[in-house]
Amino acid sequence: MPRLSAAVIYLLVILGVSALVALAWQAYPVSGSQRLRCQPACAQADLRSRNLAAADLSYTDLSWATLESANLRGATFLLSVLSGANLRESNLQSADFSNARLDRVDMRRAILVDANLRATDLRSADLREADLRSADLRGAQMSDVRLERANMQGVLLIDAQLERADLYRADLRNADLRQANLREANLRMANLDGADLTGADLAGALLPHGYTEPLLQSDEEP
């Protein structure tokens, strides 16, 4: 096999480095605006720890992207695809995910206070220990979602599909779960004080100790 000359090797190294720089650069926000150079095709982009507050990421493919610990407060993800994305410990307060695809997303310990997740696809998402206080999840598809120990005080889950969802030790105080589908959901040790489950489907669900269907009133002495 012929040996490569030093000049050829040097050229290959330069080309390789240039390609890596180009890939890294496209993930940064464009100067003076909160959009990404890679938009609308940002699949698998590495955006960890980036400051993207109030960014407009609508209609963007961010599937399998890494957004861990990113500041996305007030960002917009209208109709975006984030399937399998890593949003662990990211700040998503007041973010708008209207009609976005978030299936299999990793949002463990993410901040989603006041976030708009209405009609989103969150099937098989991991939201363990996430802060979802006052988030809007009306009509969301959440079958097989993991919400263990999540803070869901005051969350709106009207008409949400939560079949087989794991809500072990979730804080659901004052949550609105009217007409929600909770078939075979795990609600053991969940705090349901003040929650509204009018019309909710609890068939096969594991309920907190001391609670029974259909009105989910506590059987324990006050």
Label each residue range with its predicted role.
Residues 8-26:
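Hydrophobic membrane-insertion alpha-helices, especially the h-region
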Residues 28-222:
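Tandem repeat scaffolds
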